[in-house]
Amino acid sequence: MNKRVVTFGEIMLRLAPNGYYRFFQNDQLQATFGGGEANVAVSLANYGLDSVYVTKLPSHAIGQAAVNALRSFGVDTSHIVRGGDRVGIYFLEKGASQRGSVCIYDRAHLSLIHI
């Protein structure tokens, strides 16, 4: 029997300017998904371990995109509960040289808090 690792947490939509541009220097944002526990599940799946991710996500297209992102790395998403209205968002501006990175969180009224 294969052992499985189960992670539980919040996956968030990350919006970031391309490269090392600042928010006000760019009119496009790159969208990806991340979060501590989701990142662990993906890393374990990349090492060939059975990893399961548990969370709550809305039933709309952004929630499904988060599920699809996890599945694309081989993470088992069958225990994700669907419901609520919001996915957490964070905006990340990568630092360059002496300028540090900037991270702004928008986590109000998340689906996960009602699990």
Where do the model's predicted regions map?
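Short strand-connecting beta-turns/loops that link adjacent beta-strands
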Residues: 85, 96-97
